[in-house]
């Protein structure tokens, strides 16, 4: 699953590792962690355009959410997923399929995977 995550370029936005910069609090300086995000705004396409702007973000731009802990969110939300910026996706697979804009190639690559590979990728994402 992890290799498929890289292969279809989910890592283009969902970076596996980030490193903190300098902090006067020494234990926080230059620490590497794995949030699976780049914390940046990305064009997610017309399908996720909700007509609202926030700060400098256009109506179709969304900050990449961290994927760490996503597998736990189903259990913490009464057995349901509420994914994407407005909770409209009810499964990880549905959230992937809603990707557009900058992520359209990753979405298409996901849809072209075999069922076995899709399941392996989804299992990996749930393990984060």
Q: Where are the predicted features?
A:
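Electron-transfer interface patches adjacent to heme c in soluble/periplasmic c-type cytochromes
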Residues: 2-128
């Amino acid at each position: 699953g992890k290799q498929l995550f890289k292969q279809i370029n989910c890592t283009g936005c969902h970076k596996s590792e980030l490193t903190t910069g300098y902090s006067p609090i020494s234990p926080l300086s230059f620490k590497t962690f794995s949030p699976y995000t780049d914390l940046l705004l990305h064009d997610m396409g017309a399908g996720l355009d909700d007509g609202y702007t926030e700060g400098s973000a256009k109506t179709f731009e969304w900050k990449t959410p961290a994927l760490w802990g996503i597998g736990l969110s189903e259990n913490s939300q009464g057995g349901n997923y509420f994914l994407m910026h407005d909770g409209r996706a009810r499964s990880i697979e549905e959230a992937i399929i809603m990707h557009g804009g900058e992520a359209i190639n990753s979405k298409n690559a996901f849809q072209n995977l075999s069922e076995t590979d899709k399941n392996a990728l989804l299992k990996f994402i749930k393990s984060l």
